[in-house]
């Protein structure tokens, strides 16, 4: 947060730009800049910057934006840079954490000394990871809906939320409606959509060719399949009855529709972490290596996402896994995930290694999310009795999930693309031998709920190690 002037204009390794959250510092006062999801800035004149808490800054942002009390639960302050993202607790002091940023990068990232020296966090007002989707269904304030919509839209467009093309088109159609107004058959919507395609669809879905051929493509060129699908979705956006005086209400309904569609994505509202996993060995030389992944953790479970292919490699609810993290000296920290699987038809327990200096952060978050989920379970029946809008999100899952579990959906697990350690309980490993044990490989699991995770028992017909 400090030293913005010294770093201004210096490009990082990926030509990234840094945004300072302290615009001017005096002896006792400073102008703190808090960034919203749409990149707009909320300037705050703050006394005693070095000791002000995240809770106090959060309250100041809510007052400036005139947000209702629910915003205290829905949003949190984050320190964010291209290298690390940290959601602040109410008691945290953002300025002091900003001063400690290089130490945090050394501890939780593999960044080089040069990258660490140039990296600077910005203070952002973003969705609270611990805000349940069932509570989000109760939001009616249009500004709160807009902020949630802008953040979700950004995550979709940057492919942080991997989506199938069909879902991207539906979401993009809603963005067209918000930005361009109601669909009008007589207007040149196709040209507008083509010129701003990356404002409506993720970049990897709207890449076009370059060079001589692309130069001859004029405005009258035939609409591409992605553009046509987007236009069809735009045309099908349902409008609320009413005139111009109800424009705000209408926009609020489209924000809500966008968020409800995002609720179908299993990683909506997650915190994201960087890591690597082993590739399966392939070819005559048994080459393996690693692939970079993003680990998404929410109140509902854990998802491992392939950064390059932009699809899910593994998705697990907390009831389906146990976990631990290890950080031995002179070795990489590892987050271990254990789950049920099969090897050539034989039930086994699978172990996935995720190499990451953020393994400790991920393990702590998993444990806390499980604690929150268990604490919330007794309250769910009372909340659902008060009305359909307050029903918990799992009740709608059976009707929503099949839409995303289409053949080859990007949100379906691809365990075959992972290299795992397979074993049975007594240690007679199918692919790798593990020591004898009488319980799960890890003791840390969601044991108090009725989960589907089980420890595989050995049997006389188990194949030998191959």
Swiss-Prot record:
PANTHER family: FERM DOMAIN-CONTAINING PROTEIN 8, KREV INTERACTION TRAPPED 1-RELATED. It comes from Rattus norvegicus (Rat). The modification Phosphoserine is found at residues 24, 384, 409, 440, 447. The modification N-acetylmethionine is found at residue 1. Interacts with iRhom1/RHBDF1 and iRhom2/RHBDF2 (via cytoplasmic N-termini); this interaction leads to mutual protein stabilization. Interacts with ADAM17; this interaction is indirect and mediated by iRhom proteins. Interacts with LRP6; this interaction affects LRP6-binding to AXIN1. Residues 383-399 have a biased composition (Polar residues). Promotes the cell surface stability of iRhom1/RHBDF1 and iRhom2/RHBDF2 and prevents their degradation via the endolysosomal pathway. By acting on iRhoms, involved in ADAM17-mediated shedding of TNF, amphiregulin/AREG, HBEGF and TGFA from the cell surface. Negatively regulates Wnt signaling, possibly by antagonizing the recruitment of AXIN1 to LRP6. Keywords: Acetylation, Cell membrane, Cytoplasm, Membrane, Phosphoprotein. One of its GO terms (biological process) is protein localization to plasma membrane. This is FERM domain-containing protein 8. InterPro entries: Band_41_domain, FERM/acyl-CoA-bd_prot_sf, FERM_2, FERM_central, FERM_domain, KRIT1/FRMD8, PH-like_dom_sf. Residues 1-21, 379-410, 442-466 are annotated as: Disordered. The keyword Lyase does not apply. GO terms for cellular component: centriolar satellite; cytosol; nucleoplasm; plasma membrane. The modification Phosphothreonine is found at residue 420. Its main location: cytoplasm. Residues 30-377 form the FERM domain. It is found in: Cytoplasm, Cytosol; Cell membrane. The lineage of its organism: Eukaryota, Metazoa, Chordata, Craniata, Vertebrata.
